[in-house]
Amino acid sequence: HHQPRRQRQMCIRDRAINPYSALLAKKTGIKALYISGAGVANASFGLPDLALTSLDNVLEDLRRIRGISDLPILVDCDTGWGSALNISKTTKEMISAGASGIHIEDQVSEKRCGHRPNKEIVSSDEMCDRIKAARDAISDDDFMLMARTDAFAKEGLERTIERAEKYIEAGANALFPEAITSLKDYKALSEKISVPILANITEFGMTPLFSKTELKNAGVSIILHPLSAFRAMSKAALEVLSLIHISEPTRLEPI
């Protein structure tokens, strides 16, 4: 039985791109981590988020991060890497590598970043099969099986709610509606949906950079910052490298 969301504590998740960034997150008091397909593609392979990483690539990063952190880790499993049988295997391997939860999405298997155009999604029946396959592989009631849906951009709010209800019935115990554009839509979702809802707050994405308070008031209980720290690290590194390139390194200002 799910407690009403207004009593839930807000959970902030930071994307760990490697064990070092996971240590930084813990130092600041962040209570939960996230490993994303985009993060593995960007940071471990220097590639864009276009379904170019394999299950083994993500498991490798998960094991490294789990090796130095005891924080809960939610892992992006994209479309599950294959058929129902594969999804069951994916889920079991994620659990044994130390994941505290996973999310699986309803895009077609040649997926794209959720904030880019031309996304294609599968039928709700096919997605329910994905969720059931994952659910059957899970024995721990506390394990988070989150359904990510990209339906909002393709089909609008009502169809997103319909899909979400089916996904929960199939065994999802949390919802990740991607690329939602207004607080009103989050509120409408949270009023209809019985499980925790995640908001993906990524700079330069389709979702405005709403505050924690705004999202909490709209019924969101998990806020994900998938790229904020990575973008800041990248910008700082670029600035330092540029300075080194154009001036004597000894004259750098301390950072």
Language model: regions and residue ranges:
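Histidine (H) residue identity feature
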Residues: 1-2, 103, 115, 225, ...
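Intrinsically disordered, low-complexity regions enriched in small/polar residues
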Residues: 3-4, 36, 169, 232, ...
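C-terminal alpha-helical cap/extension of soluble enzyme domains
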Residues: 77, 201-247, 251
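Single conserved hydrophobic/aromatic residue that forms the stacking wall/gate
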Residues: 1-8, 12, 244-255
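Alpha/beta enzyme core
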Residues: 13, 17-71, 79-195, 199, ...
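Proline-centered helix-kink/hinge sites
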Residues: 72, 98, 196, 226, ...
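Small/polar loops that bind or transfer phosphate-bearing groups
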Residues: 3, 13-16, 177-178, 225, ...
